[in-house]
Amino acid sequence: MSKEYSTISKIYGPLMIVEGVKGVAYGEVVEIETESGEKRKGQVLDARENLAIVQVFEGTRDLDVKTTSVRFTGETLKVPVSMDMLGRIFNGIGKPIDGGPEIIPEDRRDVHGAPLNPVARAYPRDFIQTGISAIDGMNTLVRGQKLPIFSGSGLPHNQLAAQIARQAKVLGEEESFAVVFAAMGITYEEANFFKKSFEETGAIERAVLFLNLADDPAIERIITPRMALTVAEYLAFDYDMQVLVILTDMTNYCEALREISAAREEVPGRRGYPGYMYTDLATIYERAGRIRGKKGSITQMPILTMPDDDITHPIPDLTGYITEGQIVLSRELHRKGIYPPIDVLPSLSRLMKDGIGKGRTREDHPQLAQQLYAAYAEGRSLRDLVAVVGEEALSETDKKYLEFADRFEREFVAQGYYEDRSIEETLDLGWELLSILPESELKRVKKEMIMKYHPKYRKRSS
């Protein structure tokens, strides 16, 4: 049952305080009406005796405490969902912005999702091919995983996100794959880039886009990822689709969280962020996964820009605790002109072992990835040594490692923006690069794998 009040006592930032209320609950949806008849939406952030704190999604600009009325609807925030959302673009709170008609909903779902019994979760398995060698070969994405991308200001994470959204597929199940893309706090230029990228390549047909712009109220950023995940859950668990959710930029989301926390005059935690930020991020990241008895899955790739490239900053730090690895973009590789500038050494996919190997990618994949990692690490270490003693002091084997490291970056990590490599191409390229090294140095690969996949022996057998 809805209740209407005109007893607003204070408006500050994105918040308003309504006094003299009764029976108001946390999370309840609020409809706000101005003197001119304009309507806005909000949500109850805090409900105390005779008082409610409301966050206004469209912002509090031009609202007057004397002439504004507030109606408490008695419902939680719900998003209308339908299969017709595929191929559509929405703003941060779910309104169409692509010129198309309003969505006729098949259902309305709570944006906070349904609680998922941990026992009902199925373990993430099955390889997702992104077409990017540094991810597929070295830090494999697995269906049901949450694997963030740690980037920095000015690095090409937007291009990487668009490329993954365009190319990602579960092998053998392309027809049931969908992408839900949510952008928070992006500029008009970035929004146009994403629209153009999805529309020109045809990827929009299997995608749902939510775009929250930088000049939209910060409070919208709190809702946008939850809207996206609610749609993803609907596609995955009602229609058995394999859904990849890309969230960018989670740093903007956390800044909005800090802004609202400051407006509520809460005691700040590390660097001014609220003490509950870990819990809040978990309510987003933990909505990835698979459910026993359901064919569909939700895989998450949140993207965040690390302030000052600091991986110990609270946002990447807390994200790392919740998620299952990280893909780290390197400013040094970016300066070398390498795209995508993925640094495979600090990058990690904790579930990689469960999504690769015989029957999933190829039998040599686990050993090949370990050998490539070890050889590249050795080559990087020798670069530092060369800076001190010079290349003349190195052995012939050491020089081979240096050559390997250079070619690994130029040929394996680097690839074109429209280059979509299959997993076979990625693994074969890895073996081609390992052929630079003496066979005696391939200590992490079994002899039978060398005999079967090493270019020297494959050429003989063919």
Swiss-Prot record:
Pfam families referenced in this protein's UniProt entry, alphabetically: ATP-synt_ab, ATP-synt_ab_N, ATP-synt_VA_C
Matches recorded under PROSITE patterns: ATPASE_ALPHA_BETA (PS00152)
Topology of this chain in the membrane: Peripheral membrane protein
GO cellular component labels: plasma membrane; proton-transporting two-sector ATPase complex, catalytic domain
Highest rank taxon of the organism: Archaea
The entry's keywords: ATP synthesis, Cell membrane, Hydrogen ion transport, Ion transport, Membrane, Transport
Covalent S-S links between cysteines: none
Coiled-coil residue windows: none
One GO term (biological process): proton motive force-driven plasma membrane ATP synthesis
Gene Ontology MF: a single term: proton-transporting ATP synthase activity, rotational mechanism
Compartments, as annotated in UniProt: Cell membrane
Family: Belongs to the ATPase alpha/beta chains family.
Assembly notes: Has multiple subunits with at least A(3), B(3), C, D, E, F, H, I and proteolipid K(x).
Function, in words: Component of the A-type ATP synthase that produces ATP from ADP in the presence of a proton gradient across the membrane. The B chain is a regulatory subunit.
Name of this chain's protein: A-type ATP synthase subunit B
Source organism of the structure: Pyrococcus abyssi (strain GE5 / Orsay)
Gene of this entry: atpB
